[in-house]
Amino acid sequence: FKKPALSDYLQRMQPVIKQGLTRWQKKARGNQFLMYPELKRLTLDIATEVFMGEPLGKAADKINEAFVDCVKAGTAIVRYPIPGGRWQRGLRGRATLEAFFRSRIAAKRREPGSDLFSRLCIAEDEQGNRFTDDDVVNHMIFLLMAAHDTSTITLTSMIYQLGKHPDWQRRLRDEALALGKATLVHDDLGQLPQMELVLKESLRLLSPVHVLPRKTVKPVDFAGYRI
């Protein structure tokens, strides 16, 4: 999360964003346009480009579905692999993600790039120890899930709030146009204070992570309930 790395990420994001927005314009012309699924696809495309150094291509829909099933499994009441159940779909999604990342580890170690996936594959400590394949797979699944899912929810919340407050929508548009450039560098982000205000207020009103499951370290009675 140092500035040189963040600057590099921003530059790698912009062609993906431009491609996504072009797709949106074609899709939205005269049609109903649902923001959430399109944002989810875009943020996953960005995350894989930045953290993996490669586009998902034809695997995009399959990987996106696997992520969704894993997230939904976290709220499953019946945690047993009943066919067709939420937990079973989550386990199947997890297996899909594990196979996807595991199949790419050897190539990343042979020809590493500057992406985070490559760095995890070749990272060594002072004694020359590396992450195991399982370590790399678990890191990548968590990273991409956290990166694209929370970003999607946050951006969707922002768009929802801007739809309710068109005056702020105009203010953000004017602020962005005032930069006078089609692509941004890292220092430009400091020139968008109103954008930051809307982002933070959206996070305050609608948290992207609103449930955190916990369990007690030992049985306890609370408010008449045995936990």
At which residue positions do the language-model features occur?
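Transmembrane helix-loop-helix
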Residues: 9-28
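Generic, well-ordered alpha-helical scaffold segments in large soluble proteins
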Residues: 20, 50, 73, 99-108, ...
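Short, surface-exposed loop/turn segments at secondary-structure junctions
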Residues: 26-35, 57-58, 182-189
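Secondary-structure capping and boundary motifs in well-ordered enzyme cores
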Residues: 35-40, 70, 89, 93, ...
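Cytochrome P450 catalytic-core helices
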Residues: 43, 148-175
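Cytochrome P450 catalytic core segment centered on helix I
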Residues: 44, 55, 65-129, 133, ...
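Conserved cytochrome P450 K-helix E-x-x-R motif and the immediately C-terminal K′/meander segment
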Residues: 99, 103, 182-223
